[in-house]
Amino acid sequence: MSADTAAPAALTADAAVVGAGPAGLAAALELARAGLDVLLLDEQAEPGGQYYRRPGPEVLDAVGDHRPEGGRLVARVRAAGVRVLSGHTVWGVDDDRRTLLAASPGGAAVRVRARWVVAATGAYERSVPFPGWQLPGVVTPGLAQHMSAEGVRLGRRAVVAGSGPFLLPVACALLERGVRVVAVAEAGRPYTPGPASLGALRFPARLAELASYAARLARHGVRVHQDTVVARAHGADRVEAVTLTRFSDPERVVARHGVDLLCVGYGFRPQADLPRLLGCAVDRDPATGDTVPRLTPTGRSSVPHVYVVGEAAGAAGAPTALARGRAAALDILASSGRAPDRGERRRLAVHLASLAGFTRLTAALYPAPAELVPALARRLPGPTLVCRCECVTADAVRAAAAAEGGSDVPAVKGGTRAGMGLCQARECGPALEALRAGGPGTGTVPARVPLRPLPLAAVLELADTPGEDV
């Protein structure tokens, strides 16, 4: 076991940062540079998160590092003296709502107690079921982009579908790996000129990036359909074709394409389970329907020693995640008597405000998930699998929700086992919330321990610790 992954059974630090993506790395670096003892925990084998995920040496030699700045940031974090615990899964919180419970790469129990906790747990892709989504060859855009960066060609003919600005770069990444992208299907109309699109002129760099993606797709003859969603994936042993229909008119077929790869995703959801276990107050975002922590502009939660940063505070992209991580660290330093430069804090606040403006523009251009997801869920045919882990259909979820006492999400889960598989409702959660009898968006999937699947030995080890009740 490397120095990065070796850990005793109990650890203490000034600050524990959970998640080694852009936000967690930025926060850990700022805190360590100021002299704090910082622990950085991440479940992946190497720090960097999904955004800065670095391929192995053999892939680097073959295709290069598409985000070398991530490797440089990780090197600075290590040089600053941050104790990096790779391969450590934070799966719960002790009864004191302060001590973190984790499992080491070998499955050993690890308890972490720190004066400050920074939750930089990231986000996961928002999936919405459709007939055939369980077929091999149907993947999320994030997985497709990650595998493309690793030099892997997932298929020969693909459709990229869903909603959000992420679809275009994913389609371009597939093209770079030799995949024939036959179409991009966007549920909204973000590329139609209108008052909202004029706001993009205030962000010329982002506009140029979007234009470069669009130009690349045009050169390859990729058709971009707007107001279009996946109605059904067809195939026996794997996906063979996809039917696209109008989002505004489900009976109107736009196209049917033969494919062996279908990438579908509707943006990202903040991974806020850990803050919820720590007792942080949360709200429902009316635009996305997501449960988000209630935070100050610097990421401080309702629990004074807990900060939530990056995508866990609301999906907004890597530049915002980096800035949020630094802002939280500077606020912690101010609270702990290590006064940071006030000018730097002001400049960072201005930068965050500018980034927030772009996030608002994106939200205005694309359909609100709080409306999009329920609309798609309502039109699901009864036999469609909603929970792929436990093989639960839309009919079964609707029946459980209509039963007496079954109108909240936990009751639906208890009556059907939907959301009780390995993904713990990360895939089917939005559909469960939309299909419940109480109406779309009025119930949420609760945060439960363990947050992640873990070896039974880790739980038994804690249970054998004097004074511990697990």
Predicted segment positions?
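Residues forming the flavin
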Residues: 2-416, 420-422, 426-470
